[in-house]
């Protein structure tokens, strides 16, 4: 059971660090994805747009006039990246604040292609998964051993960033819990005070009523 849990955790880590998928959108539609990213972490987004061809009843490489507008916002809702790219490309950005980063994509629709159906292939890579080590080895002339050491160092650095991010999330959750508990406590005290005041007022009112009726 423990081995199965560890395997599941490793699979989830891999899926979190590298995500490959495709989705269908119309040219007027906007699709957004949320990626939790530690601070100072590189994120690479590879995408390819295909256009639906009714004659072949399939998706073909998109026309030159179709591109993708990509917008990235950090956890503070600040725009990290916003520009128009071609129908196929590679986007890279580095996070400067930890938390959820929203990646939104929509086509630069034109009157000619408006309403067409698109299929977008998307691959999001985070951390050391975003590094092309073959290119690094060729550029820096690293041996196989040096490259392996470089990979291990990058993995350790990424694990440290992930741990720091988890501590940040725990601290934020604890702060939220403490704030919520404090509000619940004050609300309970306020309710108690209101009930006591209402009870006191009802007793005074009943006493005045009985005295007016000369029952006491």
UniProtKB/Swiss-Prot annotation:
<protein>
    <recommendedName>
        <fullName>Transmembrane emp24 domain-containing protein eca</fullName>
    </recommendedName>
</protein>
<dbReference type="Pfam" id="PF01105">
    <property type="entry name" value="EMP24_GP25L"/>
</dbReference>
<feature type="topological domain" description="Cytoplasmic">
    <location>
        <begin position="204"/>
        <end position="216"/>
    </location>
</feature>
<dbReference type="InterPro" id="IPR015720">
    <property type="entry name" value="Emp24-like"/>
</dbReference>
<keyword id="KW-0256">Endoplasmic reticulum</keyword>
<keyword id="KW-0732">Signal</keyword>
<feature type="coiled-coil region">
    <location>
        <begin position="134"/>
        <end position="164"/>
    </location>
</feature>
<feature type="signal peptide">
    <location>
        <begin position="1"/>
        <end position="20"/>
    </location>
</feature>
<keyword id="KW-0217">Developmental protein</keyword>
<feature type="topological domain" description="Lumenal">
    <location>
        <begin position="21"/>
        <end position="182"/>
    </location>
</feature>
<keyword id="KW-1133">Transmembrane helix</keyword>
<feature type="domain" description="GOLD">
    <location>
        <begin position="30"/>
        <end position="126"/>
    </location>
</feature>
<dbReference type="GO" id="GO:0005789">
    <property type="term" value="C:endoplasmic reticulum membrane"/>
</dbReference>
<keyword id="KW-0175">Coiled coil</keyword>
<dbReference type="InterPro" id="IPR009038">
    <property type="entry name" value="GOLD_dom"/>
</dbReference>
<feature type="transmembrane region" description="Helical">
    <location>
        <begin position="183"/>
        <end position="203"/>
    </location>
</feature>
<comment type="function">
    <text>Eca and bai are essential, though not redundant, for dorsoventral patterning of the embryo. Specifically required during early embryogenesis for the activity of maternal tkv, while the zygotic tkv is not affected. Involved in Golgi organization.</text>
</comment>
<comment type="similarity">
    <text>Belongs to the EMP24/GP25L family.</text>
</comment>
<keyword id="KW-0472">Membrane</keyword>
<keyword id="KW-0812">Transmembrane</keyword>
<dbReference type="GO" id="GO:0009953">
    <property type="term" value="P:dorsal/ventral pattern formation"/>
</dbReference>
<feature type="short sequence motif" description="Prevents secretion from ER">
    <location>
        <begin position="213"/>
        <end position="216"/>
    </location>
</feature>
């Amino acid at each position: 059971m423990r081995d199965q849990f560890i395997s599941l955790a490793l699979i989830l880590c891999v899926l979190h660090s590298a995500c490959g998928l495709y989705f269908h959108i119309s040219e007027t539609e906007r699709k957004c994805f949320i990626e939790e990213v530690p601070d100072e972490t590189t994120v690479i987004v590879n995408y390819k747009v295909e256009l639906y061809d009714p004659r072949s009843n399939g998706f073909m490489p998109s026309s030159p006039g179709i591109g993708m507008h990509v917008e990235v916002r950090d956890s503070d809702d600040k725009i990290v990246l916003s520009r128009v790219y071609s129908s196929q490309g590679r986007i890279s950005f580095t996070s400067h604040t930890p938390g959820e980063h929203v990646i939104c994509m929509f086509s630069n629709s034109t009157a000619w292609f408006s309403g067409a159906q698109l299929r977008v292939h998307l691959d999001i890579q985070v951390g050391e998964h975003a590094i092309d080590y073959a290119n690094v080895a060729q550029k820096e002339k690293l041996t196989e051993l040096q490259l392996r050491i470089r990979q291990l160092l990058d993995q350790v650095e990424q694990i440290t960033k992930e741990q720091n991010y988890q501590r940040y999330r725990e601290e934020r959750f604890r702060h939220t819990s403490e704030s919520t508990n404090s509000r619940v406590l004050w609300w309970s005290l306020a309710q108690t005070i209101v009930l006591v005041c209402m009870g006191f007022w009802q007793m005074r009112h009943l006493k005045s009523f009985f005295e007016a009726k000369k029952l006491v």
